[in-house]
């Protein structure tokens, strides 16, 4: 991705976030975060008390009360700032996307064909089903499907990649995105969405997160935080009569300070920022998530369905050998294989034509001049070929050719079965060539497993994630490649129906499944999967079925998506642990300061030897506010992620964030107390 990455504290974003933090001080905005709403009420209450003390309407230390009140307002502002900064980063990314949208006109065709009469209309008036013509230099005005033509398209405004891509009618490369530019030739496009519903519009809406809903885990954590807040609120409320009965009633200002320091304000103030930042980090990986729920689900995934081609292997299978059947010479097999591949534009098909040319000097022949009919490959038939004169030549998977022969009254030879097994055991893909009902032999297609992929799968296994390779190869080939790559399981001879059934099977076992896809035939499985990453180069149906879109169209990105999801969950859990552990030090700071006058025995808890009750309480409140600011970078960037088992991860986080949450406040509160004392502020 070539887009400029935002600095963590971009000056313009910080200024805007500070303004938004002040705007969020209104009760309606605060009510959405129950923990910080309690702090907001406490700030308001102590402000009123400070004013009353200053005017003489109430007895007490007005300066101390004002200091507490001021730092409580700062606490609320810092929490608002964290959320506003995260939202500001997302909106800045959205603004870069808005720059792609241009007010333009489109040539709307009156008939769905090239050369038809056209009307010039504003692009924002195009409706679903309208037909438009775009030529070299034009901006594509809407999302749609190419129904005629082929062109080179610059998609860098959307994907960040400068290399142009080919878009043409038919197949999985017919989908185009509004806002991209035609570099050469022309396309006739059928609009697939109405105004405001384009992929670019949805990207902007998703990134801005204006309607961001809380995820299930976020809701569960919020409920826990509310429960803790209620417990501490009730406990604090009982302390006033408790101290009054002892003969020295503690002030309301001190009780509010105690309450604010005990409730989990750290995670309460950063919770929204963590959620927004998770989606922002996903965008940083060039993946657009439809919601925070999708990002969170990625963190809970325990089954990955990975396409073999392009994900596990390099994806450039090449014909490496012609293996003739008994009684057939190799040149006859090569000639038939080349004829069956003349109109096959896949890399495999072109490699078969080239291999026949190299081995036997068989030159390419024009399908039209031969008066031949090309039979295209389909996911259901699993074979392709050519009909020429009285010859019917097909090439395809072993099972598909076997069914084809038996349907034509033929018999699949035993020696070819042996040759197929031999090719498959070597990790190559066997394609069988047949003419009529006579098997001519086998073509070996060789692919290479990506370097380092086995180690990545070992890491995923250590994390408790099962990897399943999806391939159209036969079981022997699939087993050989699966063993070489180190995946846990595989689905061979996969059809769209088989993928859908496999996903449902895992989900019935209580597992969360993630997969990638780019074709229309992937849409049912993408719609069923818990995390479905559609390729931006794929069809409109695939992108609509998925809950994420990878702008780089890189199937391997699924592993990174899972890492980002887990990092978001870890960040939330780690900061929750840190926030709750913080309370221990605050007990030792505020409890002796507030109640030692009534119960001198509580002085034993003043292990930090803080200067005075006022400095102890003020130091705890100041630390409580400042820690939010210090943790903002961690909330936005996420905690350091390492692929470990769940138990090892728990131990690591308890040591770092649990123990850290215990020790840091002791040090921080003591340092603040010393500074207040040295400066003569208490």
Curated annotation (Swiss-Prot):
Q: Which UniProt keywords apply?
A: ATP-binding, Cell inner membrane, Cell membrane, Ion transport, Magnesium, Membrane, Metal-binding, Nucleotide-binding, Phosphoprotein, Potassium, Potassium transport, Translocase, Transmembrane, Transmembrane helix, Transport
Q: What class of enzyme is it?
A: translocase
Which amino acid positions bind ATP, per UniProt? 344, 348, 377-384, 395
For binding Mg(2+), which residues are annotated in this chain's numbering?
Answer: 518, 522
Highest taxon of the lineage: Bacteria
Which SUPFAM superfamilies does the protein's record reference? Calcium ATPase, transduction domain A, Calcium ATPase, transmembrane domain M, HAD-like, Metal cation-transporting ATPase, ATP-binding domain N
Enzyme Commission number(s) from the entry = 7.2.2.6
Annotated active site: 307 (4-aspartylphosphate intermediate)
- Quote a single Gene Ontology cellular component term: plasma membrane
Q: Where in the cell is it found?
A: Cell inner membrane
Catalyzed chemical reaction(s): K(+)(out) + ATP + H2O = K(+)(in) + ADP + phosphate + H(+)
| Transmembrane intervals | 34-54, 62-82, 219-239, 254-274, 588-608, 616-636, 656-676
**InterPro entries registered for this protein in UniProt:** ATPase_P-typ_cyto_dom_N, ATPase_P-typ_P_site, ATPase_P-typ_TM_dom_sf, ATPase_P-typ_transduc_dom_A_sf, HAD-like_sf, HAD_sf, P-type_ATPase_bsu_IA, P_typ_ATPase
Q: Which GO molecular function annotations are given, in alphabetical order? A: ATP binding; ATP hydrolysis activity; magnesium ion binding; P-type potassium transmembrane transporter activity
| One Pfam family from the record | Hydrolase
Q: How does it sit in the membrane?
A: Multi-pass membrane protein
Hydrolase as a keyword of this entry, yes or no, is no
How would you summarize the oligomeric state and partners of this protein?
Answer: The system is composed of three essential subunits: KdpA, KdpB and KdpC.
Function recorded in the entry: Part of the high-affinity ATP-driven potassium transport (or Kdp) system, which catalyzes the hydrolysis of ATP coupled with the electrogenic transport of potassium into the cytoplasm. This subunit is responsible for energy coupling to the transport system and for the release of the potassium ions to the cytoplasm.
Q: Quote the PANTHER family the UniProt record gives.
A: POTASSIUM-TRANSPORTING ATPASE ATP-BINDING SUBUNIT (PTHR43743:SF1)
Task: Name the family the entry cites.
Answer: Belongs to the cation transport ATPase (P-type) (TC 3.A.3) family. Type IA subfamily.
Tell me what this protein is called.
Potassium-transporting ATPase ATP-binding subunit
Instruction: Give the originating organism.
Output: Escherichia coli (strain 55989 / EAEC)
Source species taxonomy: Bacteria, Pseudomonadati, Pseudomonadota, Gammaproteobacteria, Enterobacterales
């Amino acid at each position: 991705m070539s887009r400029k990455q935002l600095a963590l504290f971009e000056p313009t974003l910080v200024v805007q976030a500070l303004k938004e933090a002040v705007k969020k001080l209104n009760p309606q905005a605060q009510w959405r975060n129950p923990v910080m709403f309690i702090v907001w009420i406490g700030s308001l209450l102590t402000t009123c008390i400070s004013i009353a003390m200053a005017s003489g309407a109430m007895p007490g230390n007005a300066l101390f009360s004002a200091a507490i009140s001021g730092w409580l307002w700062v606490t609320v502002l810092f929490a608002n700032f964290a959320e506003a900064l995260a939202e500001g980063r997302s909106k800045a990314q959205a603004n870069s996307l808005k720059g792609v949208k241009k007010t333009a006109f489109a040539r709307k065709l009156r008939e769905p064909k090239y050369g038809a009469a056209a009307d010039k209309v504003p692009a924002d008036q195009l409706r679903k089903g309208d037909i438009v013509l775009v030529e070299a230099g034009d901006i594509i005005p809407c999302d749609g499907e190419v129904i005629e033509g082929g062109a080179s398209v610059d998609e860098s405004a959307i994907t960040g990649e400068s290399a142009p891509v080919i878009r043409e009618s038919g197949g999985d490369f017919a989908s185009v995105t509004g806002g991209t530019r035609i570099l050469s030739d022309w396309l006739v496009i059928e609009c697939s969405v109405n105004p405001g519903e384009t992929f670019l519009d949805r990207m902007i809406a998703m990134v801005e997160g204006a309607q961001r809903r809380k995820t299930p885990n976020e809701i569960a954590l919020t409920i826990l935080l509310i429960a803790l807040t209620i417990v501490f609120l009730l406990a604090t409320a009982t302390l006033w009569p408790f101290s009054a009965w002892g003969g020295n009633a503690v002030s309301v200002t001190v009780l509010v300070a105690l309450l604010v320091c005990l409730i989990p304000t750290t995670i309460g103030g950063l919770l929204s920022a963590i959620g927004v930042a998770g989606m922002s980090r996903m965008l940083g990986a060039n993946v657009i998530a439809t919601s925070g729920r999708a990002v969170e689900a990625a963190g809970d995934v325990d089954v990955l369905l990975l396409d073999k081609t392009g994900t596990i292997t390099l994806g450039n299978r090449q014909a490496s050998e012609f293996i003739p059947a008994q009684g057939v010479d190799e040149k006859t097999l090569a000639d038939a294989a080349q004829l069956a591949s003349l109109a096959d534009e896949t890399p495999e098909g072109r490699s078969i034509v080239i291999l026949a040319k190299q081995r036997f000097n068989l030159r390419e022949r024009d399908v039209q001049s031969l008066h031949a009919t090309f039979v295209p490959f389909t996911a259901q038939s699993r074979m392709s070929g050519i009909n020429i004169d009285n010859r019917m030549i097909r090439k395809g998977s072993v099972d598909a050719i076997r069914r084809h022969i038996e349907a034509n009254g033929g018999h699949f030879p035993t020696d070819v079965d042996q040759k197929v097994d031999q090719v498959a055991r070597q990790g190559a893909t066997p394609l069988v060539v047949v003419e009529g009902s006579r098997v001519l032999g086998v073509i070996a297609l060789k692919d290479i497993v990506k370097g380092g992929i086995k180690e990545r799968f070992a890491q995923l296994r250590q994390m408790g994630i099962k990897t399943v390779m999806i391939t159209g190869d036969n079981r022997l080939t699939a087993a050989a490649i699966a063993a070489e790559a180190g995946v846990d399981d595989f689905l061979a001879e996969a059809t769209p129906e088989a993928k859908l059934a496999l996903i449902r099977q895992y989900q019935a076992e209580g597992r969360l499944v993630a997969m990638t896809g780019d074709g229309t035939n992937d849409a049912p499985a993408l719609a069923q999967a818990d995390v479905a990453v559609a390729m931006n180069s794929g069809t409109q149906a695939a992108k609509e079925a998925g809950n994420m879109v990878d702008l780089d169209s890189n199937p391997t990105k699924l592993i990174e998506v899972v890492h980002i999801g887990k990092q978001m969950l870890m960040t939330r859990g780690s900061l929750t642990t840190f926030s709750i552990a913080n309370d221990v030090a605050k007990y030792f700071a505020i409890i002796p300061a507030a109640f030692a006058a009534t119960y001198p025995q509580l002085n034993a808890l003043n292990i930090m030897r803080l200067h005075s009750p006022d400095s102890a309480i003020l130091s705890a409140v100041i630390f409580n506010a400042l820690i939010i600011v210090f943790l903002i970078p961690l909330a936005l960037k996420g905690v350091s992620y390492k692929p470990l088992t769940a138990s090892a991860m728990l131990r690591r986080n308890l040591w770092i964030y649990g123990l850290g949450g215990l020790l840091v406040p002791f040090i921080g509160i003591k340092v603040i107390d010393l500074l207040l004392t040295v400066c003569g502020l208490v």
